[in-house]
Amino acid sequence: MKMVKFVKIIYKRIPFMKIDLHGIKHENVSRHLDVFFWEMMQKGVSQVEVITGISNRMKEIVKETCKDYNFEVIENKINIGSVFVKLN
């Protein structure tokens, strides 16, 4: 008879490097993201969280900026006030 081992997997929330755009004017968001993305890529970070709040315009600016870099934007299913960005 074969012995089957059961392994308990504990899922931990992996902390993401993040930027909080609260308080940043829409016209300055792209520049803040440019600097943040550059710093994260220099550190070898592959995915970040961008906190946008519930502003649809802020999310659109983030998506437009990410499109310029061909970065993938992933909606956060748990927190609608942020998105994840995969850095290439």
Predicted regions, residues:
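Long, charged, low-complexity intrinsically disordered regions
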Residues: M1-N88
